[in-house]
Amino acid sequence: MKIEHIAMYVNDLESVRDFFVKYFGAVCNDGYYNSKTGFRSYFLLFDDGARLEIMNKPQMEDEVKSPVRTGYIHIAFSVGSKEKVDFLTRQMQEDGYEVVSGPRTTGDGYYESCIIGIEAVSYTHLRAHETLMN
């Protein structure tokens, strides 16, 4: 079994789409629009086959998102190398995104940066490698 895709509601569909395309090389479909409900969405495909659906609809409520809360808290991207982590961290910081920590090697062996992503929806963890789960 595998997770087929993960979905999240966002305020600015095109800005969020552009964020994932620019920094993570996502490929985007042409989008979907339901004229009866106003619902819109894009599917973003990443090079390893993972998919993220970003969605929007009229009259959504948007509450303040505390970084310490229950529920989904971050998306982690394995970008392949320490150099790529460093490069993306610098690029995202220069583009105005907040770097919360890193780049650094964590106690469990990840080389990562933690960045507050577009719309502060989640932390974006950039990782150089994945460790095995025990």
Language-model regions, residue ranges each:
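N-terminal beta-strand motif that seeds the catalytic metal site of vicinal oxygen chelate
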Residues: 1-17, 72-77
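Core segments of cupin and vicinal oxygen chelate
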Residues: 9-51
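Vicinal oxygen chelate
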Residues: 11-14, 75-119
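A short, acidic/glycine-rich surface segment
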Residues: 29-30, 54, 59-64, 101
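Exposed loop/turn and edge beta-strand positions of beta-sandwich/beta-sheet ligand-binding modules
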Residues: 38, 71, 109
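Short, flexible turn/loop "capping" segments at secondary-structure junctions
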Residues: 65-69
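Conserved small/polar residues in nucleotide/adenosyl-binding loops
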Residues: 124-131
